[in-house]
């Protein structure tokens, strides 16, 4: 997307905060339905990050596959479970939660200090001068389609067969 720098920065901060809040919602909310909806927020924000980086095909695949299929499947599976069992032994804070929180906070602080101490001056951005001219006239989705139908035809078909078998198995298990 060709946006001005302040708008781009604002969208990055907005989507980043959506990712953080959605991730916290996935982990901290006691109701699994609300956690699944928070996961949907995280996946939509990730898809919008792909749109900001001009990867429209990956963004569409993210929305269709993860939000449209996986997250709906998670919500569908959670709705089949008995909801009363989630609130029986719910303790607000345990020792394991404290240890996990301390480990995550220490990893976060070490990551922030590593990023801030790194010299970013020597990084050289690569150019597209050595690519073939004809590929510039094709969009990303056309290039992916060409590769899937030529170079990666056999792995693509094998993955589709494996997913079909898994779907049939899930339906058979759900019917019993």
From Swiss-Prot:
Reactions that this protein is recorded to catalyse: a plastoquinone + NADH + (n+1) H(+)(in) = a plastoquinol + NAD(+) + n H(+)(out); a plastoquinone + NADPH + (n+1) H(+)(in) = a plastoquinol + NADP(+) + n H(+)(out)
Main location: plastid
TM stretches of this protein: 10-30, 32-52, 61-81, 92-112, 152-172
InterPro entries: NAD(P)H-Q_Oxidoreduct_6, NADH_UbQ/plastoQ_OxRdtase_su6, Nuo/plastoQ_OxRdtase_6_NuoJ
Protein family per UniProt: Belongs to the complex I subunit 6 family.
Entry keyword Nucleus: no
Purpose of the protein: NDH shuttles electrons from NAD(P)H:plastoquinone, via FMN and iron-sulfur (Fe-S) centers, to quinones in the photosynthetic chain and possibly in a chloroplast respiratory chain. The immediate electron acceptor for the enzyme in this species is believed to be plastoquinone. Couples the redox reaction to proton translocation, and thus conserves the redox energy in a proton gradient.
GO MF annotation, one: NADH dehydrogenase (ubiquinone) activity
Keyword terms: Chloroplast, Membrane, NAD, NADP, Plastid, Plastoquinone, Quinone, Thylakoid, Translocase, Transmembrane, Transmembrane helix, Transport
Enzyme class: translocase
Record Gene3D superfamilies: NADH-ubiquinone/plastoquinone oxidoreductase chain 6, subunit NuoJ
Protein known as: NAD(P)H-quinone oxidoreductase subunit 6, chloroplastic
Record text on subunit structure and interactions: NDH is composed of at least 16 different subunits, 5 of which are encoded in the nucleus.
Membrane topology per record: Multi-pass membrane protein
Cell location: Plastid, Chloroplast thylakoid membrane
Classification via Pfam families: Oxidored_q3
GO cellular component: chloroplast thylakoid membrane
Entry EC number(s): 7.1.1.-
Organism whose genome encodes this protein: Solanum bulbocastanum
């Amino acid at each position: 997307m060709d946006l001005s720098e302040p708008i781009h920065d604002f969208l990055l901060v907005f989507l980043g905060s959506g990712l953080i809040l959605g991730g916290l919602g996935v982990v901290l909310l006691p109701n699994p339905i609300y956690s699944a909806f928070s996961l949907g927020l995280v996946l939509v924000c990730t898809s919008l990050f792909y749109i900001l980086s001009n990867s429209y095909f990956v963004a569409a695949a993210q929305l269709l596959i993860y939000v449209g299929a996986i997250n709906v499947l998670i919500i569908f599976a959670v709705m089949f479970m008995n909801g009363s069992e989630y609130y029986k032994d719910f303790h607000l804070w345990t020792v394991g939660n404290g240890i996990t929180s301390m480990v995550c906070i220490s990893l976060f602080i070490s990551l922030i200090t590593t990023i801030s101490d790194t010299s970013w001056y020597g990084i050289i951005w690569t150019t597209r001068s050595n690519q073939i001219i004809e590929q510039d006239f094709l969009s990303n989705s056309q290039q992916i389609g060409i590769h899937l139908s030529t170079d990666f035809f056999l792995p693509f078909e094998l993955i589709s067969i494996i997913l079909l078998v898994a779907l049939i198995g899930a339906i058979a298990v759900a019917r019993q």
